[in-house]
UniProtKB/Swiss-Prot annotation:
<dbReference type="GO" id="GO:0048339">
    <property type="term" value="P:paraxial mesoderm development"/>
</dbReference>
<keyword id="KW-0217">Developmental protein</keyword>
<dbReference type="GO" id="GO:0060537">
    <property type="term" value="P:muscle tissue development"/>
</dbReference>
<comment type="pathway">
    <text>Protein modification; protein glycosylation.</text>
</comment>
<dbReference type="GO" id="GO:0006493">
    <property type="term" value="P:protein O-linked glycosylation"/>
</dbReference>
<dbReference type="GO" id="GO:0012505">
    <property type="term" value="C:endomembrane system"/>
</dbReference>
<dbReference type="InterPro" id="IPR051091">
    <property type="entry name" value="O-Glucosyltr/Glycosyltrsf_90"/>
</dbReference>
<dbReference type="GO" id="GO:0005788">
    <property type="term" value="C:endoplasmic reticulum lumen"/>
</dbReference>
<feature type="disulfide bond">
    <location>
        <begin position="263"/>
        <end position="286"/>
    </location>
</feature>
<keyword id="KW-0732">Signal</keyword>
<feature type="signal peptide">
    <location>
        <begin position="1"/>
        <end position="23"/>
    </location>
</feature>
<keyword id="KW-0808">Transferase</keyword>
<dbReference type="GO" id="GO:0045747">
    <property type="term" value="P:positive regulation of Notch signaling pathway"/>
</dbReference>
<dbReference type="GO" id="GO:0048318">
    <property type="term" value="P:axial mesoderm development"/>
</dbReference>
<dbReference type="GO" id="GO:0010470">
    <property type="term" value="P:regulation of gastrulation"/>
</dbReference>
<feature type="region of interest" description="Interaction with the consensus sequence C-X-S-X-[PA]-C in peptide substrates">
    <location>
        <begin position="172"/>
        <end position="178"/>
    </location>
</feature>
<comment type="function">
    <text>Dual specificity glycosyltransferase that catalyzes the transfer of glucose and xylose from UDP-glucose and UDP-xylose, respectively, to a serine residue found in the consensus sequence of C-X-S-X-P-C. Specifically targets extracellular EGF repeats of protein such as CRB2, F7, F9 and NOTCH2. Acts as a positive regulator of Notch signaling by mediating O-glucosylation of Notch, leading to regulate muscle development. Notch glucosylation does not affect Notch ligand binding.</text>
</comment>
């Protein structure tokens, strides 16, 4: 073999193949240049937010309350209550009162937990809190009226609040979550443990999704999975509305999968449901790369999560999903960095203290726009912390 080391043939082959290899590298780099440039621009423009006093989300509160800077009158509030756009609450003398009716008691209980956490520092006020899935105040409605909702699009004036699901009343998924997903602080710990068991290098590189067909926007991913199962593993599960295989695109429903078991996969998909999806925040804590489909529906913390910085944005019709998956597979280090930034953001800025802090800041700012003194309504029940309810 010594002749090969100094052979003119070897030199000729090296000179012949080197330009070809360089060309392939250049071609590969240029193929993904649009995505790489987009990531670099997004990182250059990104300003990390402070962890102090949940100030990360102050801009959301300011924007949501802007329509009410002219003041909220007693007459306006009476109209909101009359129209039954949500559950009416009053705070007087650091006590919380509520009308008798609540459409979803566990959801109201989840909301009340956080208000009671900060009740001692809140001024008198009253508000209507919508615990339905859908926002109530479209922008074409004039004048804007104050209704609190957990999720909305840019077409609504609703005031976003941290959803009840951070404490209780989350979506029940039979049989794995029969009473809902449970407390966010405890679920965080489970997901972080699972992420540690499945570091990036051990994760399956097939894209993954399990969920019910709450929106047909999910259909293209399911169909892509059936066509190319090595690229995507996506199946529909049952929900309460399931009646036949028509509701799962002609195939039997898949078994539900615990969210902690999603951490085995590098690429996880988040879609809107009826409104914003409750799974979004959970997926990040797997340390996986989140593919977020569409950008219309928001919860209060969404605006600080930035595309290309914390997650991969996907067009609503999924027309670019195959190209995006090919990109992250070809640029594994880049994909891992985005996944790590997304995970760190949720770990650092969406702790339970941040939720409580947001509630306090939101209600304190909102109360400044009430142009009248609140009078407690007769017949309203005082809401007492659950730990005290065993006294009787």
């Amino acid at each position: 073999m010594e002749w090969w080391a100094s052979s003119p043939l070897r030199l000729w082959l090296l000179l012949f193949l080197l330009p070809s290899a360089q060309g392939r590298q250049k071609e590969s780099g240029s193929k993904w240049k649009v995505f790489i440039d987009q990531i670099n621009r997004s990182l250059e423009n990104y300003e990390p937010c402070s962890s102090q006093n949940c100030s990360c989300y102050h801009g959301v509160i300011e924007e949501d309350l802007t329509p009410f800077r002219g003041g909220i009158s007693r007459k306006m509030m009476a109209e909101v209550v009359r129209r039954k756009l949500g559950t009416h609450y009053q705070i007087t003398k650091n006590r919380l009162y509520r009308e008798n009716d609540c459409m979803f008691p566990s959801r109201c209980s989840g909301v009340e937990h956080f208000i009671l956490e900060v009740i001692g520092r809140l001024p008198d006020m009253e508000m209507v809190i919508n615990v339905r899935d859908y926002p109530q105040v479209p922008k074409w409605m004039e004048p804007a009226i104050p209704v609190f909702s957990f999720s909305k699009t840019s077409e609504y004036h609703d005031i976003m609040y941290p959803a009840w699901t951070f404490w209780e009343g989350g979506p029940a998924v039979w049989p794995i979550y029969p009473t809902g997903l449970g407390r966010w602080d405890l679920f965080r710990e489970d997901l972080v443990r699972s992420a540690a068991q499945w570091p990036w290098k051990k994760k399956n590189s097939t894209a993954y999704f399990r969920g019910s067909r709450t929106s047909p926007e999910r259909d293209p991913l399911i169909l892509l999975s059936r066509k190319n199962p090595k690229l995507v593993d996506a199946e529909y599960t049952k929900n309460q509305a399931w009646k036949s295989m028509k509701d799962t695109l002609g195939k039997p429903a898949a078994k539900d999968v615990h969210l902690v078991d999603h951490c085995k996969y590098k690429y996880l998909f988040n879609f809107r449901g009826v409104a914003a999806s409750f799974r979004f925040k959970h997926l990040f804590l797997c340390g996986s790369l989140v593919f977020h489909v569409g950008d219309e529906w928001l919860e209060f913390f969404y605006p600080q999560l930035k595309p290309w910085v914390h997650y991969i944005p996907v067009k609503t019709d999924l027309s670019n999903v195959q190209e995006l998956l090919q990109f992250v597979k070809a640029n594994d280090d880049v994909a891992q960095e985005i996944a790590e930034r997304g995970s760190q953001f949720i770990r650092n800025h969406l702790q339970m203290d941040d939720i409580t802090c947001y509630w306090e800041n939101l209600l304190s700012e909102y109360s400044k726009f009430l142009s009248y003194n609140v009078t407690r309504r007769k017949g309203y029940d005082q809401i007492i912390p659950k730990m005290l309810k065993t006294e009787l």
